[in-house]
Swiss-Prot record:
Protein name: Histidinol dehydrogenase
Role summary: Catalyzes the sequential NAD-dependent oxidations of L-histidinol to L-histidinaldehyde and then to L-histidine.
Cofactor binding mode and count: Binds 1 zinc ion per subunit.
UniProt-listed Gene3D superfamilies: 1.20.5.1300, Nitrogenase molybdenum iron protein domain
Taxonomic source organism: Carboxydothermus hydrogenoformans (strain ATCC BAA-161 / DSM 6008 / Z-2901)
Cofactor: Zn(2+)
Listed pathway(s): Amino-acid biosynthesis; L-histidine biosynthesis; L-histidine from 5-phospho-alpha-D-ribose 1-diphosphate: step 9/9
Amino acid sequence: MKLILNKEELLDKYSRRKAVEEDIEQQVRKILNEVASSGDEALIEYAREFDGFKGDLSNLKVSEEEIDKAYREVDDGFLNSLRKAIQRVFDFHQKQLPRSWFTTEENGNILGQIYTPVEVAGIYVPGGTAAYPSSVVMNAVPAKVAGVKRIVMVSPQKGERMNPYVLVAAREAGVTEIYRVGGAHAIAALAFGTKTIPRVDVITGPGNIYVTIAKKLVYGTVNIDMLAGPSEVVVIADSSAKPEYLAADMLSQAEHDSLASGVVITWDGELARKTAQKVEEYLKLLPRREIILKALENCGGIVVVDDEEEALQLANQLAPEHLELMLPNPFGYLAKVKNAGAVFLGQFSPEPMGDYLAGPNHVLPTSGTSRFYSPLSVDNFLKKSSVIYYSQEGFLADARDVIKLAETEGLFAHALSVKVRISNE
C-alpha cells in the first residue's frame, strides 16, 4: 500500500471518492414514494428487507422496559463517562442559545425577532459496522437545549435487539421515543409520517449514502441539518509533531468505514516516512484492520508539500470535516483556516476528544461542504420569527411610501390595504 503521496495523487483520490452512482438516487426515490403512499406497510417491509427486522409494527417502538433492561447491561464506567460527556455537550450548546430581541422606535413602532423551537425533531443514529452512543448525544442534546419537547430517534436494529449502550445514551440525552428502523425508509417515515412514526419538523444525524440521498430528497418537506458523507481528518504537521500521534490520528478516522479519509500534510519528508512506518505498525494491532486498509487505499495518505503555506492552501481546498494543526503556536495559524468543520489545535487535541467529550458537536460538514455548511447546533432546532408592531403615528409616517412602492410593483390590493386605514383616520 502506497501511503506517501503527492498533492495531485491525493486530489485524484478525493475526486473519485465524491462520485455517486445515479442509480442509488432512483432506488431511494422509490423507497420514499412507497413509504409516503403506503405508510407503515411499506416501512415494515423495508425494515425486514434492509435492516433484518424480524418483528411487526407492535414492537417497532422500543419499550421503556427494554431501556430499563439496557441500564442493567451497561457498566458503571460507561455510564459515568456518558454523563460527563452529556454535561459538557449541554454546557457548550447552551452558550449557543440566541436571545429574542425587540427595539422601540421614537414613534412607538416595535420591531423584533423571536426564536421558537421546532415541535418535533427526528434524529438518525447509524447502526452499521459499529454502535454510536456518541451520535445520540450529539444530536439529542442540542435539540433538548433548544427546547424541543418531542425528540424521535430512529436507528436500525442489528441482531436480536437494540444495542444497550445506544438505548441508555438515548434516555440520558433526552430522547422521548425510539424506533428500531434505519435507512432511507426511516428518513421517509420521519419526513412524511406514518401511523406508527410521527412526522417531524427537522431531521438530523449522519448515515450511509442511502440516508444522505434520502435527506437530500425530503428537504423542503422537512428541514435537515446537512448532507453528511464519510468521515475525514486532515492533519497539518511540522517536524515538532510526533509520528505516533499522526499515525494514530489518521487511523482513528480510517476505521469508521471504507470511504473514510485520514490525511497528513507535512513539508518534512523524514516525518512523512516515520509516520508511514507507524501506520504499518499500528495496523497490525487494530481489529478493524480491513476497513482501515480500504479507507487508506480509497482516500488516505501522507502528502509532502513545499512549505506551510502550501499545506494550508491544500487543507482549505479539501475543506475537511476535521482539521488538526499539530504545529508550534497553533493559534497563530487559526486565522488562515478558511474551511473546516472543526479545528483541533496542538499535540493534545486529537480528533476523538471532539468526537466524545470536548463539548462542540461532532456532526460536521464533510466532503468539502465546510465551505458553506456549519456544525450541528441549537440553531438547527430553532426557528426565527419577525415581530412588527406599528403605532398609529408610525403607520401614518410610512404609509404613503408603502403605497408608492406597492403601486410601482403593480400590487394595488397591497396599496389598498394601507389606503383604507388612512381614509378611516
